[in-house]
Structure formats: C-alpha cells, structure tokens
Amino acid sequence: MGFLSLVGNSFGCSASGERLVSAARDGDLQEARALLEYNPRLARYSTFGGRNSPLHYAAAQGHHEIVSLLLESGVEINLRNYRGQTALMQACQYGHWEVVQTLMLFNANVHRTDYLNGGSALHFAALHGHARCLRLVLADYVPSMPNFWNSMKDSLSEEGPSADLDEDGLFKMVNQKADGGLTPLHMAALNGHVECVQLLLDLGASVIEATIEDGTTIDLIGAGSTPLHYAACGGNAVCCQLLIARGASLSAQNASGWTPLMVARSWHRNSLEEILSKEPESRIRTVPSPYLCLPLMSIMSIAREFGWRYLNQSPVCIDPCAVCLEGSCSVAAEGCKHEFCTRCALYLCSTSYTSVSPAGAIPCPLCRHPIIAFTALPGTSPIRELPRNSLSLSFCTTCPAVNSDSTPSIASHLYRTEFQCARMPPMGSSSFRSLSCQRLPAMKLNPSFCMGAMDTNPCLIRCSRFGPSFRRSASQGESSRRAWPLTFDPIAATGS
C-alpha cells in the first residue's frame, strides 16, 4: 500500500512537473513561480526518457528570468541532460548570452563536457559563432588589467606575464580539446566565424594544435590538421589571414600529407590560392577583438559578492543610476569615477562592441573615458551566503502550499536590499541562429527538435557523399561517439 501511495504521489508530481516544463519552455514566469512556491522540489523534475530538466528547457529557449528563478529555488546548476549537456552548453549553443551571464554569476562549471563529443560550453559557443557567449564563459580567466592584450600578443616579452594573469589557466581553458583533439579554434575556423577566431586568438588560442586519430572519428580533413587546415576547408579568407598573422604555418602537413593549400584545393576554395600559396611579405597588422572587454571579471566578482538585482522598491531613489534611473548606484568605473548600478554595469560589459585604448577597455556611456575595471562603492553590503535547498527527488511527492508566514526563501538573499523606483525591464534574448555552414555547400544539417527548440547534434559534414575515398575508423562501428564537426547523428525528438 505504501508503494502505491508513493507511485500515486509520483504521478501527481509528474503532472505538476510537466506544467513547470511547459512554463520554462514557453517563458511563463508567473506560472513557473507559482508552481515552485507550491512545490520547490519540482525544480529537479526531468521529462521521462529524455531526462531534460526545466533548467535545460529555459536555457535553450533563452528565458533568463526563469533560469534565475530555478537556480534560486536550489536546482543543481550543472545538471546534465541525456546527452551530458548542461544548461550552460545549451545557452552557448543557441547564443543566449543573458542566460550564459546568469549561469556564470551562479558559478556554473565551465569545464564540464558532454557525453557524445567531449565538447565543453566553449566548443558549443565557438561552433555556432557566439562570440559574446564565448567571452562570458571565460569571464573568470581574463583579468581587468590595462596591458592584457599586449601581454598575450607578445608572450616572449622580457617583462613576463603579470602577477594578476593566470596565463597557464587561460591557455588550458582556451585550448581544451573535444574528441579527436578539436579545439574551439578549429570549430570557429571551419565555420568562418571571424569574431570568434579573433577573440580566441586574443585570449591565447594555439594555432599549432592538431587533431588526432582517436579511433572514434571520421575526419574528412585528416588527423593532424591545424586550425589553418580547417579554415582552408571552410573557405573564409579572413579567418585564414588571422591565423597566418598569429604564426600559423602554411607548410604544416596533416597525417595525409596535406598542407592547408591542398585542403583548400580539394574543397574547391579557389579564392584562397593566393593567401595560402606563399608567406606574406610583411607582417600582417592585427587589431584587438571588440569582444575582449577587460572590465568583465571585476564586475562579475562584484555582482557575485554584493548581488545584482533588487527586491525592495521605493517611491524616491536616492542617488539613482544615470543609465537606467531605477537602481541605486553600487559600483564606480575606475578612472572617470562615474557610478552605475551593478545590473547596468553588467549589461554594459556584456553588450559593448566598441573598444577604446587601451585594448579591451570599454567607453564610459557618460564621458567616453576608457573603463578597465569597476570597484564597489564604500558601504555596499555583501549578500549573505546561505546553504542551497536540497532538492533530492528519489520520489518527488507533492507538498502543501508554502505558508506565507514561513521564513524567507534563499531567493530573497540573492538580491541587494537597496531601494528602486521601478522594476528593471527584462532584457531581450538573442534569437536562434542557423546551424548550417553557409560556406560548405556539401555540408548539411538535419535539425531535430528537443526541449521545444532546435537541439541538433552539432555536426557539419554528411559522410555518405564521399564514398570510400575517405578512410573510416575501424572502431567506428563499435563506438557510438563521433566527432561532432564531421559527422551527423540525428536524434529523435522527445516528448514535452
């Protein structure tokens, strides 16, 4: 009888859980809040078979407010779906930078890799060309220091790396490898994502990293290929020039003995003949990426320590932010000393596309003075750190509505208790981007739908067209893992 009771409660939770999934997918914040107030354990609900949580649905659709709500309810931020993907990977895949920013503020694990391809959030962002997401994922590795770009550009400088720069940690992060030895730079170069290539190179991505034959891949370009080989296959001249300017070798050969020029010819990239046939006579001038954004680390640290959203409202704001005129000032820009609310400073760092001298600084919206870092204003109180709710769901049972007289939830401590005139309007989410490679006519993607959004296994090249001229790994038939940029494995959509 007790077992039947548990089963009955489980089915009751399933109905509420499906409602939460629908609310997370559709962006219904009020419905999601009401369901979580009724039963906070629903935050850990996962759909049958697909094992996709409400957090994955909200992240894939770009509903950053629902993502915040779920995290404040105590859901595990690094929860995986059936492919081993975290919410951070989903947000990076679809380019939802606001969701990425929210997850990074809650300290999402950026080192997690998925089960199918061994790719991290950086790989997903680079593959789909989302430079802003890529930069947010690396927020804790790029210090707010004025000479950062010059230090990274001239790694052989006699001065050596700055004490504030963890050069080894940044190098390992930017050059982490997925299955087959693929780095984020390989993926961005193949698809011609110039902004991602430029940013990765500025952050220390290696141009000599080569792919490997790991027994689980079908590599149509060839094992031992550098990012320049992949750029030659993709056919983007600017990507090739950027890589050559950073020291990529034109004579490097992969395991098949092909140079980048030979790869370009085999893929009929005739426009690259002149670029790849001879070394440039003079050094190619490089400019810093507009996404470098040096103040990002400082404002992210301040937001985590002091909070970035506001609960209490007041009819009159004392010292309001000059940008939004709603939140009270909590941070100041180093240099010009102009003050902003933390949320506006976060938005400024995440969306600024204009870079001023020194490289990576962003212009102050009030005086255009370069901003390299932000500092917290004196008197700003840190938020209290409370243990997060345990939401174990061995059997998720329905529970009565929360008493209005109960103690405040952890959500109330994630906001600064300062005054505010009106609620900040929600920031718009970027739209989904096409997963197809426009410059590779032989490459097609067959989108399958999962979690209410496109969740195509990020693979680019259809293999059946090439016949026996490309060698297939002997172990491919025994392994279900495939290198994502070079094969496609359609997965049927799951319900709800």
Swiss-Prot record:
One Pfam family per UniProt: Ank_4
Annotated metabolic or biological route of this protein: Protein modification; protein ubiquitination
GO molecular function, one term: zinc ion binding
InterPro entries registered for this protein in UniProt: Ankyrin-SOCS_Box (IPR050663), Ankyrin_rpt (IPR002110), Ankyrin_rpt-contain_sf (IPR036770), RING_XB3-like (IPR056760), Znf_RING (IPR001841), Znf_RING_CS (IPR017907)
Keywords noted in UniProt: ANK repeat, Metal-binding, Repeat, Transferase, Ubl conjugation pathway, Zinc, Zinc-finger
ZnF segments: RING-type: 321-368
Listed SMART domains: ANK, RING
EC number: 2.3.2.27
EC category name: transferase
Superkingdom, natural source: Eukaryota
Biological process according to GO: protein ubiquitination
Catalytic reaction annotation: S-ubiquitinyl-[E2 ubiquitin-conjugating enzyme]-L-cysteine + [acceptor protein]-L-lysine = [E2 ubiquitin-conjugating enzyme]-L-cysteine + N(6)-ubiquitinyl-[acceptor protein]-L-lysine
Start and stop residues of the ANK repeats: 50-79, 83-112, 117-147, 180-209, 223-252
Protein name (record): Probable E3 ubiquitin-protein ligase XBOS32
Species for this entry: Oryza sativa subsp. japonica
Gene from which this protein is expressed: XBOS32
